[in-house]
Amino acid sequence: MSKVLFIKASPLPNEVSRSSQVAETFMAEYKAKNPSDTVEELVLYNTEVPLLDLELMTAGRELQAGKAFTDLAPDVQKKLNAYNALTEQFLAADKYVFVFPLWNLGIPPLLKAYIDTFVIAGKSFRYTEHGPEALLKDKKAILIHGSGGIYSAGPTSSFTHGEPYLRTILQFIGINVVPSIFVEGIDHNPSKEAEIVAAAKAVAQESATEF
């Protein structure tokens, strides 16, 4: 039995977000094929995701120097507890399903803030004399990525820092990232929206059976 963490990184409701619609198709098929697995849904825009800021970095250094957690300011304790809870939730999962849009050739800022809660030296990777070593080698992920243009291939593929960035950072910590599902090109061809979404849903169903 596997534990799946379904991470939604769009503020848009499902009826508006095409990538979320495709992700729901993926999850429905996955649950049907793997009824004994547990699925936990994390909606980032409905979740307190603390920014890795000066306050958190200072608290981390103070704790490493021997300061007691209870000696931190109450608001810092609260922020650190929320941060650590996201870290532990991520580490406890076996599989990850990310659904996220491309914003200005990158990922949503809240998704970047979330990434910072689990890409942590000593937790998901460690430094060695030979360089960084991944620690999450027995886990897998799939990325479901939406964009108005087409960036998965062709002349604009070098412009994007969305799907390639998330794939790279997950691979850096050892996670096996299977082929992504792209929901793209609708802004270029609005008349083909239904066709594009249907094709992506078909890929999602097939991918779910193998995930």
UniProtKB/Swiss-Prot annotation:
> Has the keyword Flavoprotein been applied to this entry?
yes
Hydrolase among keywords? no
Provide the E.C. number(s) assigned to this enzyme: 1.6.5.-, 1.7.1.17
**Reaction equations catalysed:** 2 a quinone + NADH + H(+) = 2 a 1,4-benzosemiquinone + NAD(+); N,N-dimethyl-1,4-phenylenediamine + anthranilate + 2 NAD(+) = 2-(4-dimethylaminophenyl)diazenylbenzoate + 2 NADH + 2 H(+)
Residues involved in FMN binding: S10, S17, R18, S19
Q: Which cysteines are joined by disulfide bonds?
A: none
Keyword annotations: Flavoprotein, FMN, NAD, Oxidoreductase
Q: Name one Pfam family in it.
A: Flavodoxin_2
Q: How is the cofactor bound?
A: Binds 1 FMN per subunit.
Tell me where on the tree of life, at the top rank, the source sits.
Bacteria
The protein's matches in PANTHER family, at most eight in alphabetical order, are given as:
FMN-DEPENDENT NADH-AZOREDUCTASE 1 (PTHR43741), FMN-DEPENDENT NADH:QUINONE OXIDOREDUCTASE (PTHR43741:SF7)
Known function: Quinone reductase that provides resistance to thiol-specific stress caused by electrophilic quinones.
Subunit structure, interactors included: Homodimer.
Q: Could you say which protein family the record assigns here?
A: Belongs to the azoreductase type 1 family.
What protein name is recorded for this chain?
FMN-dependent NADH:quinone oxidoreductase 2
| Upper classification of the organism | Bacteria, Bacillati, Bacillota, Bacilli, Bacillales
